[in-house]
Curated annotation (Swiss-Prot):
<keyword id="KW-0862">Zinc</keyword>
<feature type="binding site">
    <location>
        <position position="182"/>
    </location>
    <ligand>
        <name>Zn(2+)</name>
    </ligand>
</feature>
<protein>
    <recommendedName>
        <fullName>Carboxypeptidase A1</fullName>
        <ecNumber>3.4.17.1</ecNumber>
    </recommendedName>
</protein>
<keyword id="KW-0964">Secreted</keyword>
<feature type="binding site">
    <location>
        <position position="358"/>
    </location>
    <ligand>
        <name>substrate</name>
    </ligand>
</feature>
<feature type="propeptide" description="Activation peptide">
    <location>
        <begin position="17"/>
        <end position="110"/>
    </location>
</feature>
<keyword id="KW-0865">Zymogen</keyword>
<feature type="binding site">
    <location>
        <begin position="307"/>
        <end position="308"/>
    </location>
    <ligand>
        <name>substrate</name>
    </ligand>
</feature>
<dbReference type="GO" id="GO:0006691">
    <property type="term" value="P:leukotriene metabolic process"/>
</dbReference>
<feature type="binding site">
    <location>
        <position position="237"/>
    </location>
    <ligand>
        <name>substrate</name>
    </ligand>
</feature>
<dbReference type="Pfam" id="PF02244">
    <property type="entry name" value="Propep_M14"/>
</dbReference>
<feature type="active site" description="Proton donor/acceptor">
    <location>
        <position position="380"/>
    </location>
</feature>
<keyword id="KW-0732">Signal</keyword>
<dbReference type="InterPro" id="IPR036990">
    <property type="entry name" value="M14A-like_propep"/>
</dbReference>
<dbReference type="GO" id="GO:0004181">
    <property type="term" value="F:metallocarboxypeptidase activity"/>
</dbReference>
<feature type="binding site">
    <location>
        <position position="179"/>
    </location>
    <ligand>
        <name>Zn(2+)</name>
    </ligand>
</feature>
<dbReference type="Pfam" id="PF00246">
    <property type="entry name" value="Peptidase_M14"/>
</dbReference>
Length: 419
């Protein structure tokens, strides 16, 4: 096994992958609003090249930041000088990446069917796209593959449609991996796709849903970014579009929707991880979904699955104004997190985006809700920060299983409350 690790490290170096040796993830606890604002000042210091995994929000809420080795001393001195508490969550980011690569290397095999596909390891874009083709070939009466667009770099953007027939039926949308480094989401999407085919005709609740509604599943919403996380930079978040006025690449695709676009909760700096882009829907990965959802016209639920933090969120993120359906969505969220917790005891918080975490503008579920899709929710999957975006592959199946119970709860409510 040690030999595999050495091989994977050497391979990464040979391929020119970005190195994170000595980088640490710090958990900062801002006790009051003044300390939150002080941390935001730190966030604005671009020369430190900080990567906020969980940004500043409510006082007392965890703030997780990856600090490059050359910036560690400066950041720690800054925090200590302001009396702001912090602790080290990840001692060395590269060591986790090496373990992840070793596990993937050891698990490599070409699946000949979806039954032999390894759901307990992370997969590349090509492997996931091959899986889609296998699934469609095995279940042609239930599953079809739609191409809804092409990414900035020209990759096909695929959606799996699960349907038992009929035209323009009420539908449920699920997307995963809009932030490319959140690998647990794409892996969960693959598991979901297989689960749909297994449970139809076997599980009465899911069968009732698919007998009346269609489900559209976008497993890799940001294919360029996802491919880049495998080839160059495991922690890449954004799209890969080029902004003519900047050397920095990419847009935060979950700040690019036409819902409070450009307001507080996104950045106008192309070098920021939360850069909103030049205009709403500038990213083809976003525009493809917008056009598809609008053209369809009969979506009743819109679920966007992210990681991490163990949260179930509903609109709004860009304004403190409560949505008209707050009472109902809050109850649905409560029921969903209770169902999710019932399997492994994983606890989720729930509420509106802006009151539960922080202000975020230009988000997908704010847009979908404003389009009249009442049941709009965002999941933030495991964990709460021990591994962050580098969740071990051993947690893929448990995460997918428990998340499925929450998703199924929302689907059932949608079916029973069609509007």
């Amino acid at each position: 096994m040690q030999g595999l690790l050495i091989l994977s490290v050497l391979l990464g170096a040979a391929l020119g992958k970005e190195d994170f040796v000595g980088h640490q993830v710090l958990r900062i606890t801002a006790a009051d609003e003044a300390e939150v604002q002080t941390v935001k000042e730190l966030e604005d210091l671009e020369h430190l090249q900080l990567d906020f995994w969980r940004g500043p929000g409510q006082p007392g809420s965890p703030i997780d930041v990856r600090v490059p080795f050359p910036s560690l001393q400066a950041v720690k001195v800054f925090l200590e000088a302001h009396g702001i508490r912090y602790r080290i969550m990840i001692e060395d980011v590269q060591s986790l990446l090496d373990e992840e690569q070793e596990q993937m290397f050891a698990s490599q095999s070409r699946a000949r069917s979806t039954n032999t596909f390894n759901y307990a390891t992370y997969h590349t874009l090509d492997e996931i796209y091959d899986f889609m083709d296998l699934l469609v070939a095995e279940h042609p009466q239930l599953v079809s593959k739609l191409q809804i667009g092409r990414s900035y770099e020209g990759r096909p953007i695929y959606v799996l449609k699960f349907s038992t027939g009929g035209s323009n039926r009420p539908a449920i949308w699920i997307d995963l991996g809009i932030h490319s480094r959140e690998w647990i989401t794409q892996a969960t999407g693959v598991w979901f796709a297989k689960k749909f085919t297994e449970d139809y005709g076997q599980d009465p609740s899911f069968t009732a849903i698919l007998d009346s509604m269609d489900i559209f599943l976008e497993i890799v919403t940001n294919p360029d970014g996802f491919a880049f996380t495998h080839s160059q930079n495991r922690l890449w978040r954004k799209t890969r579009s080029v902004t003519s006025s900047s050397l920095c690449v990419g847009v935060d695709a979950n700040r690019n929707w036409d819902a409070g676009f450009g307001k507080a909760g996104a950045s106008s700096s192309p070098c920021s991880e939360t850069y909103h882009g030049k205009y709403a829907n500038s990213e083809v990965e976003v525009k493809s979904i917008v056009d598809f959802v609008k053209d369809h016209g009969n979506f009743k639920a819109f679920l966007s699955i992210h990681s991490y933090s163990q949260l179930l969120l509903y609109p709004y993120g860009y304004t403190t104004q409560s949505i008209p359906d707050k009472t109902e969505l809050n109850q649905v969220a409560k029921s969903a997190v209770e169902a999710l917790k019932s399997l492994y005891g994983t606890s989720y918080k729930y509420g509106s985006i802006i009151t539960t975490i922080y202000q975020a503008s230009g988000g997908s579920i704010d847009w979908s809700y404003n389009q009249g899709i009442k049941y709009s929710f965002t999941f933030e999957l495991r964990d709460t920060g021990r591994y962050g975006f580098l969740l071990p592959a051993s947690q893929i199946i448990p995460t997918a299983q428990e998340t499925w119970l929450g998703v199924l709860t929302i689907m059932e409510h949608t079916l029973n409350n069609l509007y």
